[in-house]
Amino acid sequence: MRLPTVLIGRYIPVDSIVHRLDPRAKLLGMIFLISAVLIVPNLLFYLVPGLAIFLLMFLSRTGFKIYLAGLRSLWFFLVFAVLVQFFSSSEGEKIFWMITDRAIWSAVYIMLRLVLIILLAENFSATTPPLLSARAIESIFSTFGARKIGHEIGMVMTIAMRFVPVLALEADRILKAQIARGANFERGKFFDRIRALVVIIVPLLISALRKAEELAVAMEARLYTGEPPKTRFKDIKWKPMDTLYVLLTAGVLVLVLFGRYFVDGVFQYGS
């Protein structure tokens, strides 16, 4: 048994156009694209944000296999979301048992939305160092006069994202240790295998609490108070390419909005 790869929270250093973009531009672009994905009116218009996201993945030069591995790590979450959609709607014509045609379309839409949002989040974390992500959040909040709040939110999000791959590696280490002691996670019934995972979950929670305490002590020892720094070792500079990127992603959102409010839906179940 081997745990799947977790990409969210991992930065992949590659020299690409996407890596060289200003982190503020990438954050704004991600917000625009996620908004576009959430308000898509029909299946046809999923091509608009979908192609934009796949173009970002291609230009980032990190490889499509990495993104697929990241999706595999979240398969249980995706399947659960689809099953919830299957049984959450009783409207429409029944196809099988309690499942209706409207529920099937809802499941298709929620699956597409989740996959595209996950791919976009993976692309952002793979092309943006965690510290620059925090800088981007702080800078955007500073524009509205809330620099301290932006700094705190950025720091919390950075630490949370950095903990994802750390905990994934820790879970893999615990899994190998339990297998070496004779534990078997691949035999038995489904619920038996779920119960067997307790020997991984409990040590993982203890390890997570220990690492969080160590991080808190380290930050306190370095006199971290939560106040944003007055100076920076290296400033981030906005370039014309960043403006172009933000305009293009905003254009994707505008196009989807146009399709939602001015174009008749191809499949009405998605509206």
From Swiss-Prot:
Keywords: Cell inner membrane, Cell membrane, Membrane, Transmembrane, Transmembrane helix, Transport
Bilayer disposition of the protein: Multi-pass membrane protein
UniProt-annotated location(s): Cell inner membrane
CDD domains per UniProt: EcfT
Pfam family for this entry, one: CbiQ
Molecular function terms, GO-annotated: riboflavin transmembrane transporter activity
Top-level division of the source organism's lineage: Bacteria
Predominant place of localization: membrane
Transmembrane segments: 38-58, 66-86, 104-124, 149-169, 197-217, 243-263
GO terms (BP aspect): riboflavin transport
Gene Ontology CC: one annotated term: plasma membrane
Family: Belongs to the energy-coupling factor EcfT family.
Main function: Transmembrane (T) component of an energy-coupling factor (ECF) ABC-transporter complex. Unlike classic ABC transporters this ECF transporter provides the energy necessary to transport a number of different substrates. Expression of the complex plus RibU in E.coli allows riboflavin uptake; uptake does not occur in the absence of RibU or the EcfA1A2T complex.
Quaternary structure (record): Forms a stable energy-coupling factor (ECF) transporter complex composed of 2 membrane-embedded substrate-binding proteins (S component, RibU, BioY), 2 ATP-binding proteins (A component) and 2 transmembrane proteins (T component) upon coexpression in E.coli. A stable subcomplex with both A and T components are also isolated. This complex interacts with at least 2 substrate-specific components, BioY and RibU.
Descriptive protein name: Energy-coupling factor transporter transmembrane protein EcfT
Annotated organism of origin: Thermotoga maritima (strain ATCC 43589 / DSM 3109 / JCM 10099 / NBRC 100826 / MSB8)
Gene: ecfT
